[in-house]
Amino acid sequence: MTSQYEFSLPSFSRGYHVITDLVMKQLDDLPDVGILNLFIKHTSAAVTINESADPDVLADFESIFNHIIPENLPFLKHTMEGTDDMPAHIKAAIIGCSIQIPITNGRLNLGTWQGIYLCEFRNLGGARKLVATVIS
């Protein structure tokens, strides 16, 4: 059996945000065994799984990605939406637009320190739409 839910997250500031609880609030009862596919419908934000216990991880992600892919690169052509836009597309392509999480005993089978992240790469990204597909 397959269920699908489309929902919007509230607007987040630029950075990395743990959204595990927000995602779970959108889902009905999970099957005993299955998989959750989570897809973001945007090209300047991403979803990933990473450590959710230490807030320094969030800050370090932002610092590293901004060091590797800075704004205001003089050779970028796609700049009409702002200097943060093209770097946001590149960062989103690197991290990706979807994740898969196993469902075991009716719960997401995440590791002890793992959480679902929204990676917001725009200064003013706005509400982000996600599609959650639960396959049992």
Q: Where would I find each of the regions flagged by the language model?
A:
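Active-site histidine-anchored catalytic micro-motif
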Residues: 1-136
